[in-house]
């Protein structure tokens, strides 16, 4: 990856002009008249700042050459780590050892600043200021009184703060915007945007082929007891909507938080989905031994799977660029005759594009062992 390493582009010094000495003149020749050559005009200096209008309509003055950036939280960390990890001067939380197996090495040493939004909002301003970023970047979905929040933070720290909308429908545009803002990142931004465009186009075309009688009712669960659910309409369940399954969990007050809506066992029995997706770290491995779960259709028929979770959960947690993996994975898992491709090969391609990481066959097997490979063996 290029860009952000130095923050300044060097320009080669102009070559000295080559002149030829005129042949010697006879002493009787009249003196040669010379013309005054005007001094070269200095090239105009590049602007030090540019005006940027963010996704909230806020106009913010930014450095023209951005090489030091700070994410506002988990979603921003994931996206910025994909496009410009070497530009990051902070991280929301230190990646685990298992995550670092796939992520750029420099992320492990970055100071942690927490996050601006969410149930665990704990932005550490002292650490943020000490890292001396040129701009704080918030990415994700629009929520609450963001304009007031970002204006207040910007005034408090004296550093530009911007928001770029980056939910699944806006993610390609977000990568292109970042590619234009960050020094030397236009090509990288376009490569990531092209992958998002390819993914969403593929999903839209395939989802259109799914008729109502083919619709599979899917439930996506989280938490140690499996009763945290990402309901229909939730930001955390965007992949289900895009792929074309029916989200089996329908509630009145939809939560967009990471844990989703907590439901009761009675509600679980009423929903009784065709397929259950367990987030990594949930009860996938013990669910068949639990009488409260074993009577469910998905469990009794073996149609339950674990969502791959390295370096991040492929469906959400947080809902960010990891959803690109989730679209390819879930479509192929539920409708393999429509989303018709080799998911093992696709996984290797996606990790290479997103993280620059070459997955081995053994690593692919470990990632897909409780989902794609399990389904293929059924």
Provide a role label for each language-model segment:
Residues 2-3:
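C-terminal motif of bacterial Sec signal peptides marking the signal peptidase cleavage site
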Residues 8-47:
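Low-complexity, Pro/Thr/Ser/Glu-rich flexible segments characteristic
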Residues 49-52, 59-61, 148-228, 308-371, ...:
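Extracytoplasmic substrate-binding proteins
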Residues 55-57, 113-126, 253-265:
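Short helix-initiation/N-cap motifs at beta->coil->alpha
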Residues 70-72, 89-92, 135-139, 160-165, ...:
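Structural recognition of the beta-strand scaffold that forms the well-ordered cores
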Residues 76-131, 135-143, 245-248:
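A short, structured surface patch at a secondary-structure boundary
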Residues 117, 229-259:
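Alpha-helical, coiled-coil/dimerization segments enriched in small aliphatic residues
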Residues 131, 250-306:
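A contiguous binding-surface segment within folded domains or other stable secondary-structure elements
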């Amino acid at each position: 990856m290029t860009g952000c390493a130095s923050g300044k582009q060097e320009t080669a010094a102009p070559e000295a002009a080559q002149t030829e000495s005129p042949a010697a003149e006879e002493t009787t020749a009249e003196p040669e008249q010379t013309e005054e050559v005007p001094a070269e005009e200095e090239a105009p200096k590049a602007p030090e700042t540019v005006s940027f209008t963010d996704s909230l309509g806020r106009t913010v003055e930014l450095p023209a050459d951005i090489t030091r950036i700070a994410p506002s939280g988990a979603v921003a960390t994931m996206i910025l780590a994909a496009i410009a990890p070497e530009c990051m001067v902070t991280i929301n939380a230190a990646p685990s050892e298992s995550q670092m197996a796939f992520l750029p090495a420099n992320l492990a040493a970055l100071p942690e600043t927490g996050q601006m939004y969410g149930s665990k909002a704990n932005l550490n301003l002292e650490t943020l200021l000490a890292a001396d970023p040129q701009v704080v970047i918030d990415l994700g979905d629009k929520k609450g009184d963001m304009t007031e929040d970002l204006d207040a933070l910007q005034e408090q720290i004296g550093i530009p703060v911007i928001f770029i909308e980056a939910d699944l429908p806006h993610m390609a545009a977000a990568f292109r915007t970042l590619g234009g803002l960050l020094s030397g990142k236009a090509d990288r931004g376009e490569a990531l945007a092209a992958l998002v465009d390819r993914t969403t186009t593929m999903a839209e075309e395939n989802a259109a082929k799914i008729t109502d009688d083919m619709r599979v009712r899917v439930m996506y669960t989280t938490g140690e007891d499996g009763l945290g659910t990402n309901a229909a309409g939730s930001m955390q369940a965007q992949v289900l909507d895009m792929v074309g399954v029916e989200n089996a969990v329908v509630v009145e007050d939809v939560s967009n938080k990471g844990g989703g809506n907590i439901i009761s066992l009675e509600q679980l029995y009423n929903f009784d989905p065709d397929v259950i997706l367990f987030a990594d770290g949930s009860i996938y491995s013990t669910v068949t031994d639990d009488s409260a779960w074993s009577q469910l259709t998905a469990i009794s028929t073996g149609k339950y799977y674990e969502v791959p979770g390295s370096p991040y959960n492929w469906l959400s947690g947080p809902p960010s660029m990891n959803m690109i993996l989730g679209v390819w994975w879930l479509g192929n898992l539920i409708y393999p005759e429509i989303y018709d491709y080799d998911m093992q090969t696709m996984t290797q391609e996606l990790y290479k594009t997103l993280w620059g990481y070459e997955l081995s066959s053994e690593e692919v097997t470990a990632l897909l062992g409780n989902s794609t490979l399990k389904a293929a063996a059924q």
